């Protein structure tokens, strides 16, 4: 039986029931709904709605239901209930009879679902934080293993300056640290309890909402009942945080896909995270990374979906808000598996040092060093930049690297060039000169790794 049937004389159409029912989605809130109901039983007992014995009986029945459903989750969907709240209430009434009908006193599904969803976000958010921290640790370990593996750094996907693979790893370590901070911050803001807000105006029973919030491990109760039942900022923030993190994961995946390609061949991926072709027997495809990149779009879509759903809703609750869960659940599932998969990819990744070094030695990545050398001899940088551009054009024409020009040839471009130019053009010199906080010099990378490990 529907929880709202008394007002209606006609039958609900089968099509409307299919359209309206949310149990196939919100069944995932079962545990949170039971936990919230147990806390609510204590709350209504505290204001005399039920006796201590009745409260004890309700809580026992709810805990029994929790055990039963955990043993056979199919019970929920087989019930045909409208939503998870209806399922729990109906199952409770089946266990304790009319006593079960008292539980919803002073409570609305509006504050009930808002509470369930915040509890779910807190639980899943904590698990996501752990996954982010695991990925962070895996990437930091890779940075430590390969801190001195030289590779080209890119701008515009063209070789720019030499860096190390450890430096590349640390760039993504920074991104994931921001993701960790962002998620923790979002969970702090979501740590307020809406229960006791009723449908929109607050419950009619003068209970201690601070105690109710504490019973559910929230930091505090919400402060405005209209906002409490209509707020979905925590859903938006979780989807937004996931979207930013997925953007970082996708960028990392794209880099690694390129590094793994035959054109670069800087790294090799484990067989664990690659697949083959049904036609071409030589193929070893980076499917794990491509799927991370592909799943990013669906996470973005869910963020846009919840923002669009919420953008024009009047206060307080509207049925549109039932659409908040499907996208959120998919976001959390997608983000979680992508974090796990990214960590697995990194754990089996091998750097092809000779190929990466060879690529760094090509493409005139030491051009900036020559310009800096000219500056050290007194030439203004803008003039030095122009001179080195001419040197590069000549080197391309001769198909040689800059360091293979004779001193006499280099002097035709700038008479101030001397023999001491050549040590400045080595890969080692290119790296060593970037000995500044955040730079790619090996001591800076080692210090950065040590500092992050010490946290």
From Swiss-Prot:
A cellular component annotation (GO) from this entry: cytosol
Gene source species: Shewanella baltica (strain OS155 / ATCC BAA-1091)
InterPro entries cross-referenced by the UniProt entry: Arg_succ_lyase_C (IPR029419), Argininosuccinate_lyase (IPR009049), Fumarase/histidase_N (IPR024083), Fumarate_lyase_CS (IPR020557), Fumarate_lyase_fam (IPR000362), Fumarate_lyase_N (IPR022761), L-Aspartase-like (IPR008948)
GO BP term (any one): L-arginine biosynthetic process
Record protein name field: Argininosuccinate lyase
SUPFAM superfamilies, alphabetized: L-aspartase-like
Places the protein is found: Cytoplasm
Pathways involved: Amino-acid biosynthesis; L-arginine biosynthesis; L-arginine from L-ornithine and carbamoyl phosphate: step 3/3
Molecular-function annotations in GO: argininosuccinate lyase activity
Enzyme Commission identifier(s): 4.3.2.1
Chief place of localization: cytoplasm
Family of the protein in this entry: Belongs to the lyase 1 family. Argininosuccinate lyase subfamily.
Annotated Pfam families: ASL_C2, Lyase_1
Catalytic activity field: 2-(N(omega)-L-arginino)succinate = fumarate + L-arginine
Keywords: Amino-acid biosynthesis, Arginine biosynthesis, Cytoplasm, Lyase
UniProt superkingdom: Bacteria
């Amino acid at each position: 039986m529907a929880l709202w049937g008394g007002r209606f004389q006609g039958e609900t159409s089968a099509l409307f029931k299919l359209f309206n029912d949310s149990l196939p989605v919100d069944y995932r809130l079962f545990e949170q709904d039971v936990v919230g109901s147990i806390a609510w039983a204590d709350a209504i007992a505290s204001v005399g709605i039920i006796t201590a014995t009745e409260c004890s009986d309700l809580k026992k029945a709810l805990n029994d239901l929790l055990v039963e459903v955990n043993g056979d989750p199919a019970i929920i969907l087989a019930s045909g209930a409208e939503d998870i709240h209806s399922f729990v209430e109906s199952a409770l009434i089946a266990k304790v009879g009319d006593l079960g009908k008292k539980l919803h006193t002073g409570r609305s599904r509006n504050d009930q679902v808002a509470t369930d969803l915040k509890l779910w976000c807190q639980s899943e958010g904590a698990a996501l934080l752990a996954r982010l921290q695991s990925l962070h640790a895996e990437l930091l370990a890779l940075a430590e293993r390969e801190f001195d593996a030289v590779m080209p750094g890119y701008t515009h996907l063209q070789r720019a300056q030499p860096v190390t693979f450890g430096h590349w790893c640390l760039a993504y370590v920074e991104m994931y640290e921001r993701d960790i901070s962002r998620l923790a911050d979002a969970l702090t803001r979501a740590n307020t309890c809406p229960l006791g807000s009723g449908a929109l105006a607050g419950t009619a029973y003068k209970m201690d909402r601070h105690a109710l919030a504490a019973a559910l491990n929230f930091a505090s109760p919400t402060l405005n009942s209209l906002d409490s039942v209509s707020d979905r900022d925590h859903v938006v923030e979780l989807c937004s945080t996931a979207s930013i993190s997925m953007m970082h994961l996708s960028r990392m995946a794209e880099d690694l896909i390129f590094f793994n390609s035959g054109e670069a061949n800087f790294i090799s991926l484990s067989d664990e995270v690659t697949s083959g072709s049904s036609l071409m027997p030589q193929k070893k495809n980076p499917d794990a990374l491509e799927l991370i990149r592909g799943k990013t779009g669906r996470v973005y879509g869910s963020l846009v979906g919840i923002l669009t759903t919420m953008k024009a809703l009047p206060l307080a609750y509207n049925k549109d808000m039932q659409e908040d869960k499907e996208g959120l659940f998919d976001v959390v599932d997608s983000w979680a598996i992508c974090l796990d998969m990214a960590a697995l990819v990194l754990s089996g990744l091998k750097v092809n040092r000779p190929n990466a070094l060879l690529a760094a030695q090509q493409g005139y990545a030491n051009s900036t060093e020559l310009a800096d050398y000219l500056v050290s001899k007194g030439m203004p940088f803008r003039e030095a930049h122009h001179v080195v551009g001419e040197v590069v054009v000549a080197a391309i024409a001769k198909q040689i690297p800059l360091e293979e020009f004779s001193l006499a040839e280099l002097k035709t471009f700038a008479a101030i060039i001397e023999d001491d130019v050549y040590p400045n053009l080595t890969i080692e010199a290119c790296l060593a000169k970037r000995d500044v906080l955040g730079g790619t010099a090996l001591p800076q990378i080692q210090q950065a790794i040590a500092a992050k490990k010490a946290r």
